[in-house]
Structure formats: structure tokens, C-alpha cells
Curated annotation (Swiss-Prot):
Name recorded for this polypeptide: THAP domain-containing protein 11
SMART domains assigned: DM3, THAP
Cellular compartment(s): Nucleus; Cytoplasm
Family of the protein in this entry: Belongs to the THAP11 family.
Assigned keywords, A-Z: Activator, Coiled coil, Cytoplasm, DNA-binding, Metal-binding, Nucleus, Repressor, Transcription, Transcription regulation, Zinc, Zinc-finger
Subunit annotation: Forms homodimers. Interacts via HBM with HCFC1. Forms a complex with HCFC1 and ZNF143.
Main location: nucleus
Length: 303
């Protein structure tokens, strides 16, 4: 590599590559030269040479001076931040220790992941307790529904009598509930929810059969049909359209199409006429330009 390379052992700064650094020759003063040589060679330090004798071709970079540059106050290099030259290398750990450490870290990570998965999964005891708590509530709700339906049937059979207030087997008053409310049961409730739903459907079917002598009817709640908008325009056809009306509508459509064809032909004729006019105007402009150019040429030549 061209340029000067620092002569300090282990330092490879080059004057051609490291433009920001300064490179100095060894001083001619005997005392300064001795101090420089002592600090640079560092006799007795492992990895350094004690028989170094600098020449005019040796250079020392500014990295080894306090402040990054040699001045009148800083004349001796004292900074040698080079590992392996000014300090002993730390003994390398054997490969077996590094492998054991990596295995230990992997085991710790696996244990942490297993603990997190166990925390995320719900315990079976908790789910069982929740199911046992929900079952009495479902039974009481189904009993209240049956009592309400029985009261409604009694009131429909005896219109003049006042319906009694339904009570639960424990003696508590139960208010009538709205059967149109939709109750969503969780999947964990299992067979208890299915039994309650089947009882509710059977009771509802019995009530509808008792109230309606014509038989059970299907009632859809929450869905509305599309309103009958009627014949809003001339293209709509009602269910009672006769053959004469249909023919009349078809004739109207044919008349409209014929009129549109006539208009399109007129527009095409207008476009053709405009194109011819444009071509004539362009030809006139070219003729005028030619005459003007000839007049200019004649004027230049004095003709």
C-alpha cells in the first residue's frame, strides 16, 4: 500500500488511507528520541521488540498522542490502545463451556414457553365449576318459562277470570317474561342447554296449538318483507299485464330506438361536414402560406 504506515507494533494506520491522521518522524533530539523509542518499543512487554532502531522512513501516527496531535506541550506518544500489544490476551474459554452455556439458555427458554402455555390454558376444574353454577340457573329459567306458559293457557281458556300469579316451587313470585328475547347459551353448558331449549320449543308449540284452532303457524320475528313499490316506471310489468299493454310497451321501445338511430345518423353527418370544412380551411391556409413565402422571396431579390 502506498504512503507511510505507523511503526507502532499492531497499529496499521496508513497515510494514504487515513487522510484525517497526521504522521510524524522520530525527533532528532536525543532525549526525545529515547523517550519515543522507549514508549514505542516497550521493552519487556510480550509481543513487542526491544531492538527497534527507527530510520528516516519510519512514521508515527497522531493516534498515540494526547489530544490526537503532537504539539509543543505534547511531544511524547503515550497512548497505545492496541489489544495484544499493550495488554495480555484473556484466556479463551473452551468450546465445551460455550456449548453448555448455550444449552442451558435454550432449556431456560423452553421452560419459560411451557409456563406461558400452561398459564394461557384454562384449568379443567374452573370450567367444571362454571358449568355446575350455570346448571341451576338454567333449570330455574326453564321452570319459570313453563309456569308462564301454563298461566297464559289458563287465561286463554277462561277469559273472564283473573290469571293467577305464577310461582316457583320454592314459593317465590315469578314475573312473566318476553318469549321473543333470544338467549344465547355458551357451548360449555352442553346437555342442560339442549334440554331447556327442547322444553321451550315444545311448550311454545303447545301454546300456539291451543290459541289457534286452525293449527300451528310459523311466525318470523325480526324480518320484514320488501315493500310493494308498484309500477314506478314504464319498463315495469305487473302481474296483470295484458297482451295489448305489452305490445304497446314494445312499440314505444321500438319508436325510441328508431328516434335514437335517426339522431345518431344526423350527428354522423354533422361530424362528416365539419371534417370536410376543416380540410378546406387547412388547404386555404397552406395556399396563403405559400403565396406569402413567394412574396417574401421576390421582395428579397428585388423582383
Amino acid at each position: 500500500m502506498p504512503g507511510f504506515t505507523c511503526c507502532v507494533p499492531g497499529c496499521y494506520n496508513n497515510s494514504h488511507r487515513d487522510k484525517a491522521l497526521h504522521f510524524y518522524t522520530f525527533p532528532k533530539d536525543a532525549e526525545l528520541r529515547r523517550l519515543w523509542l522507549k514508549n514505542v518499543s516497550r521493552a519487556g512487554v510480550s509481543g513487542c521488540f526491544s531492538t527497534f532502531q527507527p530510520t528516516t522512513g519510519h512514521r508515527l501516527c497522531s493516534v498515540h498522542f494526547q489530544g490526537g496531535r503532537k504539539t509543543y506541550t505534547v511531544r511524547v506518544p503515550t497512548i497505545f490502545p492496541l489489544r495484544g500489544v499493550n495488554e495480555r490476551k484473556v484466556a479463551r474459554r473452551p468450546a465445551g463451556a460455550a456449548a453448555a452455556r448455550r444449552r442451558q439458555q435454550q432449556q431456560q427458554q423452553q421452560q419459560q414457553q411451557q409456563q406461558q402455555q400452561q398459564q394461557q390454558q384454562p384449568s379443567p376444574s374452573a370450567s367444571t365449576a362454571q358449568t355446575t353454577q350455570l346448571q341451576p340457573n338454567l333449570v330455574s329459567a326453564s321452570a319459570a318459562v313453563l309456569l308462564t306458559l301454563q298461566a297464559a293457557v289458563d287465561s286463554s281458556q277462561a277469559p273472564g277470570t283473573v290469571p293467577p300469579v305464577p310461582t316457583t316451587p320454592t314459593g317465590e313470585d315469578v314475573k312473566p317474561i318476553d318469549l321473543t328475547v333470544q338467549v344465547e347459551f355458551a357451548a360449555a353448558e352442553g346437555a342442560a342447554a339442549a334440554a331447556a331449549a327442547s322444553e321451550l320449543e315444545a311448550a311454545t308449540a303447545g301454546l300456539e296449538a291451543a290459541e289457534c284452532p286452525m293449527g300451528p303457524q310459523l311466525v318470523v320475528v325480526g324480518e320484514e318483507g320488501f315493500p310493494d313499490t308498484g309500477s314506478d316506471h314504464s319498463y315495469s310489468l305487473s302481474s296483470g299485464t295484458t297482451e295489448e299493454e305489452l305490445l304497446r310497451k314494445l312499440n314505444e321501445q321500438r319508436d325510441i330506438l328508431a328516434l335514437m338511430e335517426v339522431k345518431m345518423k344526423e350527428m354522423k353527418g354533422s361530424i362528416r361536414h365539419l371534417r370536410l370544412t376543416e380540410a378546406k380551411l387547412r388547404e386555404e391556409l397552406r395556399e396563403k402560406d405559400r403565396l406569402l413565402a413567394m412574396a417574401v422571396i421576390r421582395k428579397k431579390h428585388g423582383m
